[in-house]
């Protein structure tokens, strides 16, 4: 069996152009060594098997031989990534191929690199397919809802082992360029099959890679070559505009640089982009505005639950200048009547989530106004999912959610199945600790529907979509009311706009 599985993996690598025909013997011997084998018999027939099946079988064999170091998905991932790393071309080969493709077109280069990142199993497509996805038709357009099932949860034994493992400062974080080719351990994911492409943004060395979890099509990450904290400033706007100049078919955005309204990684300067049209991009302008001294920049307030100023021009310098002005003014802006405070006790609250894209020859920059103030009533954030929605979404509203794609926790899959069962059986939802958190939520809409076996799941999906849309409204600094719109215009006027 082991010879057959190794032959299948080598065949896969040849077929996906990770190695050539001339590399077969070399690749086979590398895999034999990793599997602790000295002998090999060439199989008569090598069937075309799915990569997940091949790797799973090799991990089973390795476990029997005591090669994994432990039980569970963490150990299996470390081992099968090592196997794929043995078949992944060296960085200089990958960069050379990318540059060759880029000379034809930026799209051809990214098409190739995205396919390559899936072929190496860096993007585990068979896990990504497990994510639950649907569309909710909100008043703001079609909102994408996903329940993230592709990121494996560590089992308790692996968590305990990681806690007891020696601390290491290398790589400094999961985004550092030093992850390329890293073998990994119980604390850090294996990245032997991971490759990055050097790019220049704002005169600095940055790198392009794809997210292994692919929340949307061609979900890429641009990361600084230097491990430094995220910072929203003029230099970042310039880098974003550089990125969409290099890759005009991609958008690029950055999480905010403050806790609560930022992403999960604030310690490493990075952006996220890709080839996908989010609901926010499709959203119309609710109100046209203009700014003195920037007559060549079209501007407007976007019809969106969060507070968004959209800038558009073929003059990228003017867009960067105006974006810097708006950011600077917002950082120091206080409007107590609208409950906007620049700082409290010396702690800053105002920042921006920026997103850049091309519209033909023009550059477009969306500036989402964010504020991370907390109160006794809202200890996790006033402009953060409120407590009555925590059963669906409690985590930060980062860049991806801001644009209209919900990334909801994996627990919801099980909880919604249990909730459906309870609804159809008439059970007391509040009495079941596994789903009691959803009891008040269900009470609010239960009388609107007739629940049947055929319809209940779709009803729950619709209500999840409705709740996530309300979460986005919570995150909006200025609400979609007359008072909210007037308060936002006060800020626009503060920036010499009208």
Where do the PLM segments sit?
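Hydrophobic faces of well-ordered beta-strands that scaffold small-molecule active sites
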Residues: 208, 252, 269-271
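Helical scaffold of the NTase/Pol beta-like nucleotidyltransferase catalytic core
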Residues: 193-195, 227-252
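Histidine-centered divalent-metal-coordination microenvironment in nucleic-acid enzymes
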Residues: 217-219, 224, 262-278, 368
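Active-site microenvironments that recognize anionic phosphate/pyrophosphate groups
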Residues: 1-222, 226-229, 305, 319-323, ...
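Beta-rich nucleic-acid/ligand-interaction surfaces
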Residues: 259-267, 345-351
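Structured alpha-helical segments in the cores of large, soluble enzyme domains
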Residues: 206-211, 236-244, 290-297
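Catalytic or ion-translocation cores adjacent to nucleophile or general acid/base/metal-coordination motifs
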Residues: 244-264, 273-334
């Amino acid at each position: 069996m082991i010879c057959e599985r190794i032959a299948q993996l080598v065949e896969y690598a040849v077929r996906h152009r990770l190695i050539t025909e001339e590399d077969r013997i070399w690749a086979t011997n590398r895999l034999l060594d990793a599997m602790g084998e000295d002998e090999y018999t060439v199989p008569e027939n090598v069937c075309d098997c799915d990569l997940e099946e091949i790797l799973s079988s090799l991990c089973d064999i390795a476990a029997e031989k005591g090669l994994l170091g432990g039980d569970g998905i963490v150990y299996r991932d470390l081992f099968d990534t090592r196997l794929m790393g043995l078949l992944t071309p060296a960085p200089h080969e990958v960069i050379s191929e990318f540059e060759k493709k880029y000379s034809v077109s930026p799209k051809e280069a990214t098409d190739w690199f995205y396919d390559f990142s899936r072929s190496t199993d860096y993007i585990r497509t068979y896990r990504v397919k497990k994510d639950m996805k649907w569309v909710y038709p909100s008043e703001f357009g079609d909102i994408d809802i996903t329940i993230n099932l592709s990121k494996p949860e560590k089992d308790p034994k692996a968590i305990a082992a990681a806690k007891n493992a020696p601390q290491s400062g290398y790589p400094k974080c999961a985004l550092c360029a030093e992850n390329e080719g890293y073998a990994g351990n119980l604390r850090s994911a294996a990245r032997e099959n991971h490759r990055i492409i050097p790019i220049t943004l704002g005169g600095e060395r940055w790198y392009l890679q794809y997210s292994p979890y692919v929340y949307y099509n061609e979900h890429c990450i641009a990361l600084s070559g230097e491990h430094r904290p995220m910072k929203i400033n003029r230099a970042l706007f310039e880098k974003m505009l550089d990125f969409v100049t290099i890759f005009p078919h991609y958008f690029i955005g950055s999480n905010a640089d403050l806790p609560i309204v930022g992403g999960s990684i604030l310690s490493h300067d990075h952006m996220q982009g890709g080839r996908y049209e989010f609901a926010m991009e499709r959203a119309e302008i609710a109100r046209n505005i203009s700014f003195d001294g920037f007559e060549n920049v079209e501007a407007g307030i976007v019809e969106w639950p969060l507070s968004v100023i959209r800038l558009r021009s073929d003059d990228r310098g003017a867009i960067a200048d105006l974006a810097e002005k708006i950011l600077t003014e917002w950082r120091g802006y206080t409007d107590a009547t609208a409950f906007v405070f620049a700082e409290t006790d010396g702690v800053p609250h105002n920042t921006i989530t920026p997103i850049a894209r091309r519209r033909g020859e023009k550059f477009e920059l969306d500036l989402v106004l964010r504020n991370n103030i907390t109160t006794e009533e809202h200890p996790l954030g006033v402009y953060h999912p409120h407590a009555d929605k925590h059963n669906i979404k409690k985590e930060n509203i980062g860049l991806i959610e801001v644009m209209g794609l919900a990334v909801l926790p994996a627990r919801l899959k099980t909880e919604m199945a249990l909730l459906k069962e309870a609804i159809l059986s008439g059970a007391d939802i509040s009495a079941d600790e596994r789903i009691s958190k959803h009891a008040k939520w269900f009470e609010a809409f239960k009388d609107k529907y007739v629940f049947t076996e055929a319809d209940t799941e779709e009803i729950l999906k619709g209500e999840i979509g409705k709740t996530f849309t309300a979460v986005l409204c919570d995150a909006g600094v200025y609400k979609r009311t007359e008072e909210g719109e007037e308060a936002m215009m006060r800020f626009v006027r503060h920036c010499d706009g009208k």
